[in-house]
Swiss-Prot record:
Pfam families associated with the record: Hydrophobin
Gene Ontology annotations for the cellular component aspect, listed alphabetically: extracellular region; fungal-type cell wall
Protein name, as recorded: Unclassified hydrophobin 8
GO molecular function: structural constituent of cell wall
Species: Pleurotus ostreatus (strain PC15) (Oyster mushroom)
Amino acid sequence: MMFSKPVVLATTALATFAAATPLVARTEPTCSSTEIKCCENVGTAAVVSSVLTPILVSIPLVGPLLSLLGLNAVVALLFGTVDVVLGLTCSGIDVGGSCNAQTVCCENVQFNGLINVGCVAIDIL
């Protein structure tokens, strides 16, 4: 019983803080120039499957899972959803450089840069 008051106080404080924190909709991706990628293939797993499948097969332990479970199950397992937008065959863009494919900003990079996850198409001037 001695710990009940601190626990109630901490829980109340956290709930108050969470309720007071405003939610802000993201309309533009926040991406620094070092995170901008030029990707030849951008889309969901279904859209980029012909490029994604050989990449996944080449990754140890993922290849056998792909054979057992199929592409959608492996993508959901690795990235949380089959609807995540992936960037494949990507390279960085130097300041002042150009991109002859799709310019994207991606939330994170997986498998040493082979797969860029959570990508949003952007326009650069």
